Amino acid sequence: MLTDYLQACERGLEPLFSPQILSAVMALSRQRLVERPHGDLPRWMAALDALPAGPTNCALDQNTLTIGRAGEQNEEAVKLALQGLIPWRKGPFEFFGVPVETEWRSDWKWQRVAPHLSSLQGRRILDVGCGSGYHCWRMAAAGASCVVGIDPTILFLVQYLAVRRFAPDLPVWFLPLRMEELPAEGGQFDTVFSMGVLYHRRSPLDHLLELKGALCAGGELVLETLVVEGDECTVLMPQDRYAMMRNVFFLPSVAMLSRWLERCGFVDVRCVDESNTSVQEQRSTDWMRFQSLPDFLDPEDHSLTREGYPAPRRAVLVARKP
């Protein structure tokens, strides 16, 4: 199945990438999925294969991405197969009447972002750090001509394949890559999304320049990241952990982040949303049983993390490549 997917992916991306770039990204993808796969990949693929096959209705333009109808398949068998892909972090989904209540309400983020986007109709889109692909499917449903999601987490790719199993004709592709692994020659995309990635990067300016390089002239960047309150000189670098995460490096103020974007050559920079992350938006569920945001906050003061830093606050900025 993975070989078939990679072949279809290569055909689907031929109009987007030069032969040199396509060859490089597909070689790295094959290495990670076929030649030197993750040790749990056979188990995940067995769970995927246990899902029913064949065409069904898919509703991907709504908050809960819905595959099939209740009663169309054996719900217990579907649930057992989907449980083989736990933890589910980004969603929500419903497969044949089985709700998959993911850790994140990714639909809430989409509701904050979508009103401020240029029309996605006919656009070529890159979604960096795409997770399970939830937002990729929303972008396709909004009319994108091609959506490429990249994320190095192989389980997320298998979760994407669970949806693709029933929507094989949509132009949505997942590559198991990091942004810095895309070849430098770029400029293919009309819109680039980076949501929940920047604070994990040791060099945030390099990440912004990589995003800019992927955009065509006049293309739109949608950047969502953790921020702190303050002026254009304010940035938080945690001493060790932030919200129990060791891989968080820079949390700028919106003003500082705007300056970073401008220094990297973006224009028309604007902040379109800024909001605190609630324990209703990110929490443990039966489909993600590990610790989540409520465990990462000060138990007596949810305005602080366990380390005493300001609790997670996220901003969405939109900018343009001239």
Curated annotation (Swiss-Prot):
Stored CDD domains: AdoMet_MTases
GO biological process: tRNA wobble uridine modification
InterPro entries to which the protein is assigned, alphabetical: CmoB, Mo5U34_MeTrfas-like, SAM-dependent_MTases_sf
Catalytic reactions of this protein: carboxy-S-adenosyl-L-methionine + 5-hydroxyuridine(34) in tRNA = 5-carboxymethoxyuridine(34) in tRNA + S-adenosyl-L-homocysteine + H(+)
Function: Catalyzes carboxymethyl transfer from carboxy-S-adenosyl-L-methionine (Cx-SAM) to 5-hydroxyuridine (ho5U) to form 5-carboxymethoxyuridine (cmo5U) at position 34 in tRNAs.
Family designation: Belongs to the class I-like SAM-binding methyltransferase superfamily. CmoB family.
Protein name (database record): tRNA U34 carboxymethyltransferase
Species of the source: Alcanivorax borkumensis (strain ATCC 700651 / DSM 11573 / NCIMB 13689 / SK2)
